[in-house]
């Protein structure tokens, strides 16, 4: 599983300029099964994505994100193996 941390590198007006395209890309990625959760950081300095796809598919998808393409955010991809989860989240366990 992967946690992807996005950190904005540009002023918020530039983030907002690219936001609609980013949201459209994000919806497509959800439809393709790349991500299982996404949201903004509080305070609004970036966002977090959660993915259970393979690394090659993840990297290919991230390369299409308008925030990446236009240099709006930097991306940190962190892999981890879940070995304990709350009830109802068994699908997140690594086998």
How should each PLM-predicted stretch be described?
Residues 1-95:
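Conserved, structured core segments of small domains
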């Amino acid at each position: 599983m992967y946690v992807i941390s996005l950190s904005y590198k540009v002023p918020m007006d530039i983030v907002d300029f690219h936001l609609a395209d980013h949201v459209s890309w994000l919806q497509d990625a959800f439809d393709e099964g790349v991500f299982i959760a996404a949201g903004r950081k509080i305070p609004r300095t970036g966002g977090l994505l959660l993915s259970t796809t393979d690394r090659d598919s993840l990297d290919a998808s991230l390369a299409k994100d308008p925030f990446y393409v236009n240099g709006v955010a930097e991306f940190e991809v962190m892999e981890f193996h879940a070995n304990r989860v709350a009830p109802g989240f068994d699908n997140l366990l690594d086998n």
